[in-house]
């Protein structure tokens, strides 16, 4: 994280080492006041983008997540596919449109937008002995995480 902050100019190596008197950061002007935080978080960050990748699933479709919950672009890299949902069967609730793929974007490899779906999984599909077997867990998952059963 420190290397990323230095590379992006947020802090210097001297500041991290405690040897420099930090100059006022241009980010300080963007700092939210306490009353603003809830409203900003409720709006979220805009991550929807245009994409040439067509949605291949529709609401009601059965899907299965990839068996390996790993980043297929960067070995050992960031992914939003939870390990507990790897290989699980679910159904598409809705298509959110196309959004930035974190597996690529988190590693400065571009936004690589692709379709993002809300997928419902029965609790019994995710855990061997769920407290309430008829409960559902809904995950927002990118198209590259999903396959047809």
Locate each region found by the language model.
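A sequence-level detector of short, solvent-exposed, charge-rich linear segments
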Residues: 20, 24, 35, 111-114
């Amino acid at each position: 994280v420190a290397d990323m902050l230095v590379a992006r100019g947020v802090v210097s190596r001297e500041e991290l080492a405690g040897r420099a008197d930090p100059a006022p950061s241009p980010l300080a002007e963007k700092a939210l006041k306490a009353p603003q935080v809830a409203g900003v978080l409720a709006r979220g960050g805009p991550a929807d983008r245009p994409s040439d990748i067509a949605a291949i699933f529709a609401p009601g479709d059965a899907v299965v997540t990839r068996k390996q919950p790993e980043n297929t672009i960067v070995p050992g890299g960031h992914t939003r596919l939870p390990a507990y949902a790897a290989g699980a069967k679910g159904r598409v609730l809705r298509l959110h449109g196309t959004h930035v793929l974190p597996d690529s974007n988190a590693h400065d490899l571009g936004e690589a937008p692709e379709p993002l779906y809300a997928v419902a999984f029965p609790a019994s599909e995710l855990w061997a002995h769920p407290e309430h077997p008829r409960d559902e867990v809904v995950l927002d998952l990118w198209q590259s995480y999903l396959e047809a059963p």
